[in-house]
Design a protein with these regions (language model features):
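Terminal hydrophobic/aromatic helix or amphipathic segment near a protein terminus
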Residues: 207-255
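Catalytic helix-loop patch of NAD(P)-dependent Rossmann-fold dehydrogenases
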Residues: 45, 80-129, 149-155
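Alpha-helical substrate-binding/gating segment
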Residues: 113, 142-149, 158-211
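Conserved Rossmann-fold NAD(P)-dependent oxidoreductase catalytic core, especially the SDR/UDP-sugar
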Residues: 49-99
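Amphipathic terminal alpha-helices
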Residues: 260-268, 272-300
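Glycine-rich "substrate-gating" loop/helix at the edge of Rossmann-like oxidoreductase active sites
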Residues: 96-97, 127-135, 153-165, 191-194
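NAD(P)H-binding glycine-rich loop region in Rossmannoid oxidoreductase-like domains
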Residues: 3-4, 8-49, 57, 75-78
Length: 300
């Protein structure tokens, strides 16, 4: 599509962001450093300072609208989340992970910049995104298909969000940026709707893609074995100056409930998932079979 102009730059450099946003009417600020394995300074530079650069570029060019992609992890305090609304989720006093802390700082700055006259902003946050080209969530589980085991009892429930449902939420976010909108300066979570059992969701992915069922393997005790092991890995990593993939944060995310009430997004943004779970999985499965498996299919 010749209407799309590609620009490669560094989000941490103000001059690059200024050049990329010149001529825009609305910015969807989606770029972020994600995953739990980077250094604190890198998270801060991209997710906080990068957002400040986007705000500055918007003001420089007179861009009045910005939709920020945030994360529900900015509200995680470590406990179960069972059907809570956004209004019931506060920024925690202590963050579980550097990524969440940096995203929260960026989101706060973006919402503070909204004055409802010269600049309008809203934060839209998907939870556990999956779909074609997913190289973070499903990829990291599937690549370890042979050795992965269920953590805990395997009954924990989460919300997931198909990537096109997420994109739909972002588009609706832009439409809600106008004077007097109830969405201004607000944080909304978008999901596929009904929550799922995390390990059932993963097990279906494994079986449909030709890997052994997780439910047929022995389970690993979560809080009494995997969590202490994760803390041990953290300690060793600190001494060695490196990060292991097994962290207390990642173990906790595999054990707790994380599902949300999305009525606020429905009411204020008009959000409804545009793909059903079955439709979403069909598209996801096709990509993983046709593109992902030929490259990564052997697993570990």
């Amino acid at each position: 599509d010749d209407r799309i102009v590609w620009f490669q730059g560094d989000l941490t450099k103000q001059s690059d962001v200024d050049a990329a946003l010149e001529g825009a009417e609305c910015v969807w600020h989606i770029a972020a450093l994600v995953g739990p394995y980077h250094k604190r300074d890198a998270y801060d530079a991209v997710n906080r300072v990068g957002t400040l650069n986007v705000i500055a570029a918007c003001k420089k060019h007179g861009i009045k609208k910005c939709v920020m992609s945030s994360s529900p992890s900015t509200r995680f305090d470590g406990g179960d989340i069972n059907g809570k609304r956004e209004s019931e989720l506060d920024f925690p006093k202590t963050y579980l992970q550097e990524y969440a802390e940096s995203k929260a700082a960026g989101e706060r700055a973006m919402m503070d910049a909204c004055d409802g006259v010269n600049f309008f902003s809203v934060a839209v946050a998907p939870h556990q995104v999956y779909g074609p080209r997913d190289m973070l969530f499903l990829h990291n589980f599937l690549i370890n298909a042979k050795r992965l085991r269920i953590f805990g009892n395997g009954e924990n429930v989460i919300s997931v969000c198909y990537v096109d449902n997420y994109c739909h939420g972002l588009i609706l976010g832009e439409r809600a940026l106008y004077p007097g909108s109830p969405a201004l300066k607000k944080f909304y979570i978008c999901t596929d709707g009904e929550p799922v059992k995390l390990w059932d969701f993963l097990d279906k992915a494994f079986v449909d893609l030709g890997y052994p069922s997780l439910r047929k393997k022995f389970k690993l005790p979560g809080w009494t074995f995997m969590m202490p092991l994760a803390y041990a890995c953290d300690a060793v990593g600190y001494v060695l100056g490196k990060k292991f993939k097994l962290t207390p944060f990642s173990v906790r995310m595999l054990l707790i409930n994380r599902w949300f009430n999305i009525e606020a997004a429905k009411k204020d943004l008009g959000y409804e998932p545009i793909y059903t779970p079955d439709e979403a999985w069909a598209k996801t499965r096709a990509w993983f079979e046709d593109v992902w498996k030929p490259k990564y299919g052997a697993g570990r």
